[in-house]
């Protein structure tokens, strides 16, 4: 199973043009089963989604999990995309603590690899806030199956510190430097893999239009069920 995470910066590329189809082409090349998006909606008014759902499905086979009743496809900019073949159970929108508004989306999935919980999030700019937010996510996940993956923009520049709170229950996967897309210097985007799942491959996707579609590069991870 391939999971991807991608901060798409509202589909505004390094040429400062909003080009949703360019993002969709990158997602098509990623060929992931599920995707956590960050900055997936516009920030004004009703915050409409930036990716047209019809074109998204036609190019990638991915559908947006409907977690709102309005034109936005997500929550605090987060959106989850799921390929056909995965059944979606309970979904939940989480507000995260901190100085700035942050959130996460949580979904129970059932498919070819069994059941699991996926969390997509975009953590805050201050390390203290990020640690509070991770603690909140761990509390929410504590009543669910340990087969869980957290995916998103962790906003953590250090490859060594800042996510220590996860290490007891999760393996943190940092595929590589994903920001800034023009010259990657920081591993801001990461995964955390819970018990019962094993990472068998991961990377930063730099092919095709990924270098100019957003200020972040997408990351991917392949996982398997543990026997």
Language model regions located:
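Short, flexible/disordered intra-domain loops and linkers
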Residues: 44-51
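Phosphate-coordination/substrate-recognition cap region in phosphate-metabolizing enzymes
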Residues: 52, 56, 60
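Active-site regions of metal-assisted phosphoester/phosphodiester hydrolases
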Residues: 1-34, 42, 59, 63-227
């Amino acid at each position: 199973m391939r999971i991807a995470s991608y901060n798409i910066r509202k589909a505004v590329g390094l040429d400062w043009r909003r080009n949703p189809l360019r993002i969709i082409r990158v997602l098509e090349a990623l060929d992931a089963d599920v995707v956590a998006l960050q900055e997936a909606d516009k920030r004004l008014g009703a915050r409409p989604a930036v990716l047209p759902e019809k074109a998204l499905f036609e190019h990638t086979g991915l559908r947006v999990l409907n977690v709102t009743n309005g034109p936005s496809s997500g929550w605090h900019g987060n959106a989850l995309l799921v390929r056909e073949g995965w059944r979606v159970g309970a979904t939940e929108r989480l507000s995260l603590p901190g100085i700035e508004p942050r959130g996460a989306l949580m979904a129970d999935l059932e498919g070819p690899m069994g059941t699991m919980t996926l969390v997509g999030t975009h953590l805050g700019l201050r390390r203290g806030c990020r640690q509070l937010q991770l603690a909140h996510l761990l509390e929410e996940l504590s009543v669910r199956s340990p087969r869980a993956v957290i995916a998103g923009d962790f906003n953590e520049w250090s490859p060594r510190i800042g996510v220590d709170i996860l290490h007891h229950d999760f393996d943190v996967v940092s595929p590589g430097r994903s920001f800034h897309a023009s010259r990657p210097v920081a591993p801001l985007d990461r995964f955390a893999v819970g018990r019962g799942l094993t990472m068998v491959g991961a990377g930063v996707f730099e092919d095709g239009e990924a270098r100019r579609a957003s200020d972040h590069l997408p990351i991917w991870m392949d996982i398997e069920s543990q026997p």
